Swiss-Prot record:
Record flagged with keyword rRNA processing: no
Family annotation (InterPro entries): HMG_box_dom, HMG_box_dom_sf, UBF1
Protein's UniProt keywords contain Ribosomal protein: no
Protein name in UniProt: Upstream-binding factor 1-like protein 1
Subcellular location: Cytoplasm; Nucleus
Polar residues composition-biased segments: 183-197
DNA-binding region boundaries: 101-169, 225-291
Annotated stretches, region: Disordered: 167-197, 305-394
GO cellular component terms, semicolon-separated: cytoplasm; nucleus
GO biological process: blastocyst growth; embryo implantation; regulation of gene expression
Length: 394
């Protein structure tokens, strides 16, 4: 798909400019299939700078090659623009509100700010790093009473800062820290009657046996991540973080993704299916290599954990005993189990009995929905953590 004329000419800024020009030239009432709108687009009006209409068209064909094409051209351009904008501004700090109070300087920074000019004159050839090292040492050598004065000034200004921040948040509630979700992540599970007498055991069981931890704990260090189970699972993972769906609630997002899946042409579904098959093959190879690196004890623990995965999920929901992940009986580790031919297939085979293989990963929509939810919540939590990391604490 890459043209020799376009290689090395397009910067990220140029690509964003191309997408903006395309947006301006797409009709506002665009609701047709993207191919029809793309065919009617006047590329001579899209052209800008050194890039002709034909070059712009060719570059757009390269960009849209990996995009899902069952939507309108407007939606495709918006998704491409969002992905490039996110990539360009990934490491930029969000601009703070102009009225937001400034956090006071710490005791050391106050000392540093006061003394830096003096030491710059004393050591004109020193770099900033060298000056900082000297001033840090000088601050450590300060008498306790002088250091206390800097600390008291900081505490006083910090109290004023906290008062101003409370007033600021009342005036600008959106600018403060994001509110925590009131939706519980998981329902509390029942605790066995036998453990009611031991309060510590009760608390640990509630924490370790929640539905969320059952699925997340079944993962050994270095174990390859499982690929999508089928074409719809792959489509769902890609669609979940799509910019035009982010404003929807989880439930509505599920419904919308399902609706869109029914509109996907058969050739697109076949494309997703082929991708999944390729990922499954890669996963089997990686898993096979990873299993061969395990010690006999680690392999025995892994096989036992995967064999009892389905049982453990059922027991956790009904309040049964849940053993710690990764533990195995001494007798199992002493056996020194080695990987035999076909063992990887046995561990991955969804059709075998649950007592000897992994159960619950492939059977039924409920398992599929649980996997979707885990992947989706990881995407949303990562986005949330990125945005909340720029806020300052009170």
């Amino acid at each position: 798909m890459t043209s020799l004329d376009n290689q090395g000419l397009w910067s990220e800024k140029d690509i964003l400019k191309l997408l903006e020009c395309m947006e301006h030239n797409i009709p506002s009432d665009d609701s047709r299939e993207f191919k029809k709108s793309q065919a009617d687009l006047n590329w001579s009006k899209v052209a800008f700078g050194l890039f002709s209409g034909e070059m712009c068209k060719q570059k757009w064909m390269e960009i849209s090659y990996n995009l899902r094409k069952f939507r309108t051209l407007t939606e495709l351009v918006q998704e491409a623009k969002f992905s490039f904008t996110k990539k360009t501004h990934k490491n930029k700090i969000l601009t703070e509100h102009p009225d937001r109070p400034k956090r006071p300087l710490t005791a050391y920074l106050r000392f540093y700010k006061e003394q830096r000019a003096k030491y710059c004159q004393m050591y004109p050839k020193y770099s900033n790093a060298q000056l900082t090292k000297i001033l840090a040492e000088k601050y450590r050598q300060l008498p306790a009473e002088i250091k206390q004065r800097y600390i008291m000034d900081f505490k006083k200004e910090k109290e004023d800062f906290q008062k101003k921040m409370r007033q600021f948040k009342k005036r600008h509630p959106v600018s403060g820290h994001p509110k925590k979700s009131v939706v519980p992540q998981s329902h509390p599970t029942k605790v066995p009657t036998k453990s009611q007498g031991d309060i510590k055991n009760v608390k640990s069981l509630v924490k370790t046996e929640s539905p969320r931890t059952v699925s997340s704990d079944m993962k050994f260090q270095g174990e390859p991540r499982k690929p999508p189970m089928n074409a719809y699972h792959k489509f769902h993972q890609e669609s979940w973080s799509s910019p035009e769906l982010r404003h929807l609630s989880f439930r509505k997002r599920w419904v919308e993704i399902s609706r869109r899946w029914h509109q996907v042409p058969e050739n697109e579904k076949e494309h997703y299916s082929n991708q999944v098959k390729r990922l499954q093959k890669q996963y089997r190879v990686k898993l096979d290599l990873w299993l061969k690196r395990l010690s006999p004890e680690e392999y025995a623990a892994y096989k036992e954990a995967k064999a009892t995965c389905g049982k453990r999920k059922n027991m956790s929901m009904s309040g049964g005993r849940s053993s710690k992940f990764g533990r195995t009986e001494q007798s199992s580790s002493e056996k020194g189990l080695q990987i035999k031919p076909g063992e990887v297939e046995e561990l991955l085979d969804p059709g075998t009995d649950s007592s000897g293989t992994i159960q619950g990963h492939h059977d039924g929509a409920q398992s599929s929905r649980q996997d979707f939810t885990d992947d989706s919540e990881e995407d949303d939590s990562s986005t949330s953590s990125d945005s909340s990391s720029t806020d300052e604490d009170d």
